[in-house]
């Protein structure tokens, strides 16, 4: 009797889960996911978005490298995606009912020496997430290697304000903007020194790094950040006038 009851419960749970997948799939998109970086995700540090140490920058191990179709030449850096293993296709590999929200922090390059369905997982036009190993193991089993997934863009939740790290040299301020909440994906950045009343549009250099070619030494710095959804926030005088290249400053502003 106990075995029959347990079987019925399992069948009900499975039915409910598959109904859930079917009901949400219309609003979600299909892709595949693999993993990299090791069990502690140490191999995911750095990357094509320029965030550096993902542990200290607030992203931890819930990250992924995106294929060409999703990376959008770096414009997708900082964006967040909810990912669910598609148990309707590989129930033996999925962890039922589990999903995870990851941040795009890296680029998964194509491998044209291999077929798109046999090793060249990140070849265009395939949408693909190469997830940090701990993130992948939240939704699927290690032995799966690769699984079909459902994904959708979601808002990013961050602790604290946006962070501005200033690199470069005189007349070339290269500013990494990290820990961005809300839509996450930056579309435009402005900078203003305390000796000016005019906001200067910065150009994106690579990943989440934006540059200015103005001499700004000895000035406190303010930034305006616009996301891909059009929302704008200003971090006024977030950088003090005695700043030095290589320093990072955390604002009290976020989306």
Swiss-Prot record:
UniProt keyword terms in alphabetical order: Cell wall, Cell wall biogenesis/degradation, Membrane, Secreted, Signal
Further comment: Plants silencing EXPA17 exhibit reduced number of emerged lateral roots. Plants over-expressing EXPA17 show increased density of emerged lateral roots.
InterPro entries documented for this protein: Expan_Lol_pI, Expansin, Expansin/allergen_DPBB_dom, Expansin_CBD, Expansin_CBD_sf, RlpA-like_DPBB, RlpA-like_sf
Pfam families in the record: DPBB_1 (PF03330), Expansin_C (PF01357)
Induction or repression: By auxin.
Membrane topology note: Peripheral membrane protein
Signal peptide region: 1-26
Entry annotated with the keyword Secreted: yes
Record-level GO cellular component terms: extracellular region; membrane
Main location: secreted
Expansin-like CBD domain boundaries: 171-251
One example of a Gene Ontology biological process annotation: plant-type cell wall loosening
Family to which the UniProt record says this protein belongs: Belongs to the expansin family. Expansin A subfamily.
Protein name as it appears in the record: Putative expansin-A17
Originating gene: EXPA17
Domain of life per record: Eukaryota
Transmembrane segments: none
Biological role stated in the UniProt entry: Causes loosening and extension of plant cell walls by disrupting non-covalent bonding between cellulose microfibrils and matrix glucans. No enzymatic activity has been found. Target of the transcriptional activator LBD18. Regulated by LBD18 to promote lateral root formation.
Subcellular location: Secreted, Cell wall; Membrane
Domain Expansin-like EG45 intervals: 46-161
Species whose genome carries this gene: Arabidopsis thaliana
